[in-house]
């Protein structure tokens, strides 16, 4: 029988959600960032653990590039990205000398850092910890799941786009979740059509409905479709709070709905 893990620095974290994608370029880190912002505006304290070691993009999305982490009494202190200290972030991007520096590490070194991130970051009290993972399935994913398993993560949020090739990759991601015993909270389809800002007509730039159909066939919840949205892209490039600044944009209701569905999965958060 496996021994229970010491809660350590995750003792104050109520719910852990992994964000996965079958391939790169589907907007996984975008969904992680916007979900964190939406949860924050719902009154929750949120942490983001960016373990996409070779592509740590979240510091830029949250305008936190160049910030430094430091060692506290209980471990690494994450970077707070807002004045209220309601969103904290830990990323390998904070450990690089230059933002565009390549991480050229072999598997064992990556896995060791992932385990250190899980055990040694002093998160304090959080309602949600979102874990932004690399694309695909690899040793790094196994390291993340193994390190978090003793802490009973809520499950995985899987991100795809409508194209058949992306949907095929997500099938493998869902198989991975089943094999490692990781519950799938739901599937999100990103980049699902472009809504004209003038007439509000939606044009399906890629194929249509692949994510929803896959969710139905796989027997997992479909949490929603997020359209292509220039204002969302602009907010990420500028490090702005999309949920606060663009409530009338096409992507806003979709992202808010996904956050509400995550909230409905869990009991009331911290006061």
From Swiss-Prot:
It comes from the Eukaryota. [4Fe-4S] cluster binds at residues 196, 199. Its cofactor is [4Fe-4S] cluster. One of its GO terms (molecular function) is metal ion binding. The keyword ATP-binding applies. InterPro entries: Mrp-like_CS (IPR000808), Mrp/NBP35_ATP-bd (IPR019591), NUBP2/Cfd1_eukaryotes (IPR028600), P-loop_NTPase (IPR027417), YlxH/NBP35 (IPR033756). SUPFAM superfamilies: P-loop containing nucleoside triphosphate hydrolases. ATP binds at residues 22-29. Component of the cytosolic iron-sulfur (Fe/S) protein assembly (CIA) machinery. Required for maturation of extramitochondrial Fe-S proteins. The NUBP1-NUBP2 heterotetramer forms a Fe-S scaffold complex, mediating the de novo assembly of an Fe-S cluster and its transfer to target apoproteins. Negatively regulates cilium formation and structure. Belongs to the Mrp/NBP35 ATP-binding proteins family. NUBP2/CFD1 subfamily. This is Cytosolic Fe-S cluster assembly factor NUBP2.
């Amino acid at each position: 029988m496996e021994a229970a893990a010491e809660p350590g620095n995750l003792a104050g974290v109520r719910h852990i959600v992994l964000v996965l994608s079958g391939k790169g370029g589907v907007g996984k880190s975008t969904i992680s960032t916007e979900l964190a912002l939406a949860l924050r505006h719902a009154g929750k304290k949120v942490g983001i653990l960016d373990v996409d070691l070779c592509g740590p993009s979240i510091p830029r999305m949250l305008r936190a590039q160049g910030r430094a982490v430091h060692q506290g009494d209980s471990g690494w202190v994450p970077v707070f990205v807002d004045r209220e200290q309601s969103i904290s972030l830990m990323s390998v991007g904070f450990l690089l000398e230059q933002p565009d520096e390549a991480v050229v590490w072999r598997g064992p070194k990556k896995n060791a850092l992932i385990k250190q991130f899980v055990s040694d970051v002093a998160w304090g009290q959080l309602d949600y910890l979102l874990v932004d993972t690399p694309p695909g399935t690899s040793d790094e994913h196994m390291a993340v799941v193994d390190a978090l398993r003793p802490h009973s993560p809520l499950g995985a949020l899987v991100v795809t786009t409508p194209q058949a090739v992306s949907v095929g990759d997500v099938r493998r991601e869902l198989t991975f979740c089943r094999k490692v015993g990781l519950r799938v909270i739901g599937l999100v389809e990103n980049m699902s059509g472009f809504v004209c800002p003038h007439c509000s007509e939606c044009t399906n730039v890629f194929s249509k409905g692949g994510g929803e159909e896959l969710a139905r066939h796989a027997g997992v919840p479909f949490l929603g479709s997020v359209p292509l949205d220039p204002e969302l892209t602009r907010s990420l490039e500028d490090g702005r709070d999309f949920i606060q600044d663009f409530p009338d944009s096409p992507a806003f209701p979709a992202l808010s709905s996904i956050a509400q569905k995550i909230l409905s999965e869990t009991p009331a958060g911290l006061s």
